[in-house]
C-alpha cells in the first residue's frame, strides 16, 4: 500500500511541477493519468471518495483534487453527458423535480460532475426535510459548495486563461460554470474552437479576471466525444 501511495505522490509532484512551469498539462501528463487509471483505478476512486466524503478526515490538496477531477473522466467516460443535458432541459422548462432526479443520476455516474454539484448546492435549501435523501444534521448546501470549490480551484491551478496557458477542463459545460462561479465573468458569448482549445472573447472583465479573452484546453473533452460517437 505504501508503495502505491509513494507512486501516487510522485505523480502529483510531476503534475504540479508541470503546472507551475507551464500552467497547463502537456501530452505526457495526460498519458500519465491514463496509465494510472489503467494500472491503479482504485487510487483515483479513493481520491474521489475522499473529495465527496461528508466528513473527510483530511481534505484533499488542490493537486489531489485536480487528479481526482481529471482521473474521474477516465472512470465515467462521459457516460453522464446525455443525462446532464436532460437536467439542463428540465431547468429551462422550470421542472425542478425532473432536474433534481437527473442531477442525482449524473452524480451516480460521475460524483464530481461540476454542473450537477453546483445545481444540487443551489437546490439544497429546497430539499430540507427530505428525510430519505437529507440526513439529520447534514448541511447539504455547504457539502456541495465545498466540493464545487475544490473542483474550481483545481481547474484554476492548470493555467491562467491565456492561449499559451489555457485552463484545463474535462467537459465543455465546465467552462461556463468555471467562468461564472470562479471568475465572476458575465455576458459570455459563444466560443471559437481552435484545435484542442476553446477561446471566449469577453465583453467585460471582473475582479478575478482582467483579460480580453479566456482559453480552455479541451483535449480530454474531444477524446470523450470521439469515444461516445464510436459507441
PLM regions and their residue ranges:
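Short coil/turn linking the two alpha-helices of tandem helical-hairpin repeats
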Residues: 75-80, 121-133
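Residue-level recognition of tetratricopeptide repeat
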Residues: 112-113, 148, 152-155
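Canonical positions in the second alpha-helix
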Residues: 105-106
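N-terminal alpha-helical interaction modules that lie
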Residues: 20-100, 163-231
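Bacterial Sec-dependent N-terminal signal peptides
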Residues: 1-25
